[in-house]
């Protein structure tokens, strides 16, 4: 999955798993709520969509030193853990450490400064909304 982190693409059982709803992960646009057919969880998904998700999947550029995030690292705002990293690593195209993780929707805005704990040390990170590679999606493979 080359350039996955640079494109902010999630992966199954990391960003996309039964613990997270479609509104939280940004996959809501793929759910056909308008169809008459029922599916398990439709009423809950509709309620979350209408009320807005409690948390959102976000991308962070991390000021890592010699170790990158891997997954399950806490995301701190001041002295409070507000979320956890779902996956991350070194983005070779931009030469930056990138993390994907969930934070409360109220905090999910570009430029948010957080800290991500890596091996017991908190490292500064910035929430980014624009993919680091091909933000317009023009280089997507056919």
Features from the language model and the residues they span:
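Conserved, structured C-terminal
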Residues: 1-142
């Amino acid at each position: 999955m080359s350039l996955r982190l640079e494109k902010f693409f999630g992966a199954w059982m990391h960003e996309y798993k039964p613990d997270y709803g479609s509104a939280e992960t940004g996959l809501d646009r793929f759910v056909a709520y308008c169809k008459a057919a029922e599916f398990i969880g439709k009423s809950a998904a509709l309620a979350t969509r209408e009320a807005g998700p409690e948390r959102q999947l976000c991308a962070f550029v991390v000021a890592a030193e010699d170790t990158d995030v891997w997954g399950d690292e806490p995301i701190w705002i001041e002295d409070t853990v507000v979320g956890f990293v779902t996956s991350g690593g070194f983005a070779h195209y931009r030469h930056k450490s990138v993390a994907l993780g969930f934070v409360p929707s109220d905090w999910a805005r570009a430029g948010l400064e957080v800290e991500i704990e890596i091996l017991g040390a908190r490292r500064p990170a910035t929430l980014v909304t624009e993919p680091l590679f091909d933000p317009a999606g023009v280089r997507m493979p056919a």
